[in-house]
From Swiss-Prot:
Keywords from the named record: Coiled coil, Cytoplasm, Nonsense-mediated mRNA decay, Nucleus, Translation regulation
Function: Key regulator of the exon junction complex (EJC), a multiprotein complex that associates immediately upstream of the exon-exon junction on mRNAs and serves as a positional landmark for the intron exon structure of genes and directs post-transcriptional processes in the cytoplasm such as mRNA export, nonsense-mediated mRNA decay (NMD) or translation. Acts as an EJC disassembly factor, allowing translation-dependent EJC removal and recycling by disrupting mature EJC from spliced mRNAs.
Entry coiled-coil feature ranges: 132-171
Native source organism of the sequence: Salmo salar
Annotated Basic residues bias: 90-103
Protein name: Partner of Y14 and mago B
Biased composition (Polar residues): 120-131
GO molecular function ontology, one term from the record: ribosome binding
InterPro entries for this protein: PYM1, WIBG_mago-bd, WIBG_N_sf
Top-level lineage group: Eukaryota
GO cellular component, one term: nucleolus
Record text on subunit structure and interactions: Interacts (via N-terminus) with magoh and rbm8a; the interaction is direct. Associates (eIF2A-like region) with the 40S ribosomal subunit and the 48S preinitiation complex.
Gene name linked to the record: pym1b
Location within or outside the cell: Cytoplasm; Nucleus, Nucleolus; Nucleus, Nucleoplasm
Gene Ontology BP annotations: exon-exon junction complex disassembly; nuclear-transcribed mRNA catabolic process, nonsense-mediated decay; positive regulation of translation
């Protein structure tokens, strides 16, 4: 839809238009060289341009010849279009498996799901008593506390050097927790 322009002695205007609710829009002045968004051509890269310019038919074939060729192909018995015609071997195998599952019925799926649910719940005690998991968790906590302690030390250095003139409430809280972090780190290192 093109924008209706009106020209008079003072310049170019977009004409006053009526809104769906019945009110009128004011006419708007348009600067020289302005092109409305609807009229700006959409960017197309070279591949899009190539495929738009590419003919649908092979070179030398007319649209009438194409219709005849399609009718001849439909008449050939071996070219009947089936749902598996363009599929690979793997896709055909997967379709056969799906059909077998449908024929077996939903009972086998229910049994498989029940077995899958029962297996993980049978040994939750073994998972919590795993010593390597507990050691890994302690190592992770130690690493985390060392990181927090390093951040507190860096913050203290910045305050001492004057890089930070006034500490915020959160920064003061972090400095206040330094002793608790050190105690927790020492306790974890003694336990491991």
């Amino acid at each position: 839809m093109a924008t209706p322009y009106v020209e008079d002695e003072s310049g170019k205007y977009i004409a006053a238009t009526q809104r769906p609710d019945g009110t009128w829009r004011k006419p708007r002045k348009v600067k020289d060289g302005y092109t409305p968004q609807e009229e700006v051509p959409v960017y197309e890269n070279k591949f899009v341009k190539f495929f738009k310019g590419k003919p649908d038919l092979p070179p030398g074939m007319s649209p009438g010849d194409e219709a005849q060729a399609r009718q001849q192909q439909q008449g050939i018995p071996g070219i009947a279009e089936s749902e598996t015609a363009g599929l690979s071997k793997t896709a055909k195998r997967n379709m056969k498996r799906k059909e077998k599952r449908k024929l077996q019925g939903p009972d086998s799926n229910v049994e498989a799901l029940i077995n899958a649910v029962e297996m993980p719940t049978s040994n939750p005690a073994e998972a919590t008593n795993d010593p390597s998991g507990a050691a890994a968790e302690k190592a992770k906590k130690i690493k985390n506390l060392k990181k927090k302690l390093r951040q507190v030390e860096e913050l203290q250095q910045k305050l001492d050097s004057g890089e930070i003139k006034q500490a915020t409430k959160e920064q003061l809280d972090k400095l206040g927790r330094a002793k608790a972090i050190q105690d927790g780190l020492l306790q974890l290192e003694e336990d491991s």
